[in-house]
């Protein structure tokens, strides 16, 4: 059978190499070794060869694999903002030391986006929804682990989840947008903590409404709230607001360098990173006209 894949041109190789350099700078803190651990099937040796432009030994399939992961096409470039670094520090600490944290941050501060760039297979991020029941919450957690809870009881699903996590090296569960969960589902945080203390990292993360909800629940002696508050150390950690430098770096990484345009986007965004993304796209589209 004839190979119909297009050969990787020298020009495209140079573009992919530039995208790799940008990935190392913005996503891996300037460390090629860290980048190799974040990228799939891309060794530190490959990265060194590509950065030194000694490309003869690199196959086209390797180039294509790298392009999919760092390619500039129309993909939004992520920058290591203060919030990104803060969250990654907490995620790493919770994973390696089986710690438990409650994290809050205003919408648009990059919480969910940061969870999408965790380079570890043993991290399970539950994206909460208002419609979650106890069963659908457990089914989602099992799905993230590559397992099915179909046709089993909640107790059986919980048992599988716990046994699976206990066999993993440095596992971490992140319950994102936890303020969307009803009380009955939120109580699973207590059950998971009780079964996995010292064996698995646990994080609940949401907007500041979660803190208000927990504080109110503790004050009113609502069932389970004192237990949740105790397990996160009676303290919520706050994601820092994106700075002007953070937002300028994001704008520049995504193709806009004009100072006036950057300032305009910053002023309109109100430090909401989702708004920054929309404004950058609008500006780039306008420039094409």
Where are the language model's segments positioned?
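The conserved phosphate-sensing helix
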Residues: 244-245, 267-284
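Conserved small helical "lid"/interfacial subdomain of P-loop NTPases
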Residues: 237-262
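Short glycine-rich substrate-engagement loop in P-loop NTPases that contacts/grips substrate
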Residues: 128-168
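Conserved P-loop NTPase "ATPase switch" module shared by AAA+ and STAND
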Residues: 164-185, 189, 193-196
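Sensor-1/coupling segment of RecA-like P-loop NTPase cores
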Residues: 102-107, 181, 193-224
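Conserved AAA+ ATPase "SRH/arginine-finger" region at the nucleotide-binding site
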Residues: 126-131, 216-229, 233-245
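A short, basic N-terminal segment
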Residues: 1-97, 282-289
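Walker A/P-loop nucleotide-binding motif
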Residues: 93-117, 129-130
């Amino acid at each position: 059978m004839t190979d119909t894949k297009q050969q990787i041109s020298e020009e495209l190789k140079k573009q992919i190499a530039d995208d790799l350099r940008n990935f190392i700078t913005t996503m891996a803190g300037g460390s090629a070794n860290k980048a190799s651990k974040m990228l799939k099937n891309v060794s530190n040796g490959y990265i060194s060869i590509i950065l030194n432009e000694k490309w003869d030994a690199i196959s086209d399939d390797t180039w294509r694999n790298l392009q999919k992961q760092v390619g500039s096409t129309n993909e939004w470039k992520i920058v290591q903002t203060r919030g990104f670094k803060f969250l990654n520090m907490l995620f790493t600490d919770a994973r390696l030391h089986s710690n438990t944290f409650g994290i809050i941050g205003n919408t648009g501060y990059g919480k969910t986006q940061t969870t999408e760039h965790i380079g570890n297979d043993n991290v399970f991020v539950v994206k909460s929804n208002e419609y979650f029941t106890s069963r659908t919450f457990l089914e989602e957690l099992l799905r993230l682990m590559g397992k099915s809870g179909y046709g089993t009881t909640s107790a059986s699903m919980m048992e599988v989840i716990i046994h699976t996590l206990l066999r993993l090296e440095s596992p971490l569960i992140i319950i994102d947008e936890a303020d969307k969960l009803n009380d009955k589902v939120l109580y699973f945080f207590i059950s998971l903590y009780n079964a996995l203390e010292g064996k698995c990292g646990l994080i609940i993360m949401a907007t500041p409404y979660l803190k208000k909800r927990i504080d109110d629940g503790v004050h009113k002696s609502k069932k389970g709230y004192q237990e949740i508050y105790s397990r996160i150390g009676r303290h919520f950690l706050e994601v820092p607001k994106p700075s002007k430098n953070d937002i300028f770096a994001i704008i520049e990484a995504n193709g806009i360098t004009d100072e006036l345009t950057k300032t305009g986007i910053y002023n309109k965004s109100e430090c909401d990173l989702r708004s920054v993304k929309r404004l950058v796209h609008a500006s780039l589209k306008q420039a094409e006209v």
